[in-house]
Amino acid sequence: MIKIFAGLKGSGKTKNLIELVNAAQETTSGCVVCIEKGSKLIHEINNKTRLVDISEYAIETAEQLYGFVCGALSANFDITDLFIDSALKICAEDLEGLEKFANAVKPLLEARNVNFTMTISIELEKVPASLKPYLA
């Protein structure tokens, strides 16, 4: 399942993500992973959650993010929930690339039964049609 929180800065996307991360950590029997650029969520996220600062890995494009997610999924078969905060920022504001990323990663997530949630800072009207079904 893919879920996307979209909206402009200050619309509560990250707050919703934090609540979902912590709720997932309380109920999962596997591993919860949260990817962000920087470490602003370190005090907000349950300490059992694997919090990854993507900037430590020089990920700057949607293609690189896809490779990173594939690597995480292949190395950790027990991931049940994957969260990405500010996905569009991680992808250098490349909306087309992010759209390709979401469509490419979907079958991998479904095959492994991984719940996937990401936030993107964008006006709702500018969300590509292929991503609109995932809007939360």
Regions found by a protein language model. Give the residues of each.
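Conserved P-loop
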Residues: 1-71, 127-129
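Detector for Asparagine
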Residues: 16, 22, 46-47, 76, ...
